Amino acid sequence: SISACNGLKGHFLIEPLKLSDSEKTDLLNRSHDNAQLSPINLVVAVIMAHEMGHGMVLPGTK
């Protein structure tokens, strides 16, 4: 399903972030509450995590 696919994308995006377990759990829970998590929301979540000073590693970046 589309929501399951987006949920998986959320996991893959969140995993590289240097988040504590509680932060990851909170972010995943909020993402999963959003049945139709859009790519824009995922991008915003990644940007927000970056802005908060977490080390971010994205595929294709060094």
From Swiss-Prot:
Subcellular location: Secreted
Cofactor (UniProt): Zn(2+)
Principal EC category: hydrolase
Keyword tags: Cell adhesion impairing toxin, Glycoprotein, Hemostasis impairing toxin, Hydrolase, Metal-binding, Metalloprotease, Platelet aggregation inhibiting toxin, Protease, Secreted, Toxin, Zinc
Tissues in which the protein is found: Expressed by the venom gland.
GO cellular component: extracellular region
Domain of life of the source: Eukaryota
Cofactor binding: number and manner: Binds 1 zinc ion per subunit.
GO-annotated biological processes: proteolysis
Annotated EC: 3.4.24.-
Post-translational modification: The N-terminus is blocked.
Active site: 51
Molecular-function annotations in GO: metal ion binding; metallopeptidase activity; toxin activity
Residue intervals of the Peptidase M12B domain: 24-54
Main location: secreted
UniProt record similarity statement: Belongs to the venom metalloproteinase (M12B) family. P-III subfamily. P-IIIc sub-subfamily.
Physiological role: Snake venom Zinc metalloproteinase that inhibits ADP-induced platelet aggregation and inhibits the alpha-5/beta-1 (ITGA5/ITGB1) integrin, a fibronectin receptor. Has caseinolytic activity. Induces the detachment of cells that are bound to fibronectin.
Quaternary data: Dimer.
The protein's name: Zinc metalloproteinase-disintegrin-like BaG
Organism: Bothrops alternatus (Urutu)
